[in-house]
Amino acid sequence: MQNPRFLDRTTPPKIVTLILVAGLSALTMNIFLPSLPGMALYYDVSYGVMQQSVALYLALSAALQIIIGPISDRYGRRKVLLGSLVLFLLATIGTLLAPTATSFLIFRMAQAVIAAGMVLSRAVVRDMVADAQAASMIGYVTMGMSLVPMIGPVIGGVLDDLYGWKANFALLLVLGLGTLALVWADLGETASLRRVSLAEQIRTYPALLASRRFWGYTLAAAFASGCFFAYLGGAPYVGDKIYGLSSTHVGALFALTAIGYAAGNFFAGRYSIRIGMNRMILIGCIVTTVGMALLALLTLLGLSGPTTFFGLTIFMGLGNGICLPNANAGLLSVRPELAGTASGLGGAILIGGGAALAAFAGVLLGPGSTEMPLILLMLASSAASVVAILFVIRRARQIGAA
């Protein structure tokens, strides 16, 4: 494969392009979170209704990831990503013009097409390098990517306080246009195109689903990130209704998780080859679980508050930053020739589980509730991730895999 040359669409992309593509996908998920209570007032609906803009977005992202992978294996990463960006821009315009909560939710769901950025940035990395190298490169890519959502809620909260919630979606529109131009100029095709039909590619799913290691890696990633998705679904309510914080304050506190995630990504990028994928995943899952257990204990002891609740989520970010690059590389390595399909299917399971947990978090929180139900949900999800990766390690020893 040719060496990447910046702004040359005949060669593979530079890392910065993959960072920005994946970053836009992540930013779309969280920039508007501090605005959720205000959006509920704007449309005169309950917080639970507007919170579904998170859960429904994640659910459609999961569905799309099932087909994005196989389509990109057949038609190429470049064409699929460019088409997805165009559709994302149209959906974003729709969110700005939506007159009702229902129409907003429809366009918000359509924005989920940007999930192609997450799927294909990982698949492009796997096209270019293999195994532990892929884990290391994904670690560096997601470390850079995490800088975008790190400041996203902060910017979103400030924009909401100054100009209203629509300013967040206007910013996404501008960034989407810039990303489209960059992808057009820099992302050359990296996939070895497979001249088979989409139906034939989907029929390869059983080969992946029959792999215990694929399930182990996928569930480890799903439960580890599920802790974070539950947090996304419930933290805006906790910050606004329980702690009485402003949108700007909530957005700033969201950055703590992202700081931990960036640190975890750096650790993954630096040490994945030396320590190994499976042990790195286990370390990440344990870090998250210990952090959530400490948060639950302090809350039970009556030491709850914004500092405790938001501060300890830095461990969740750190653990996810270590776990996810390695878990993603692991599920892609099970069948390397199906990297795009594995990325899409694994991502669908991961995001689908996240959608369910985000929706459940919204159900748990309501008038008179405390933060404890959300904390216990996050703890249960992180503990399940430890069980999943221990299964992978046991299975790897049985078959002699690395």
Regions found by a protein language model. Give the residues of each.
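Paired small-residue
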Residues: 87, 91-94, 102-110, 307-313
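Cytoplasmic helix-loop-helix junction between adjacent transmembrane helices
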Residues: 107-144
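Helix-loop-helix hairpin linking two adjacent transmembrane segments in secondary transporters
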Residues: 103, 139-185
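A late C-terminal transmembrane helix in Major Facilitator Superfamily
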Residues: 328, 332-368, 378
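Membrane-interface helix termini in secondary transporters
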Residues: 38, 66-70, 74, 158, ...
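Juxtamembrane intracellular "pre-TM" segments in multi-pass secondary transporters
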Residues: 2-8, 188-218
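Conserved MFS/SLC helix-loop-helix module at the cytosolic interface between two early adjacent transmembrane helices
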Residues: 63-101
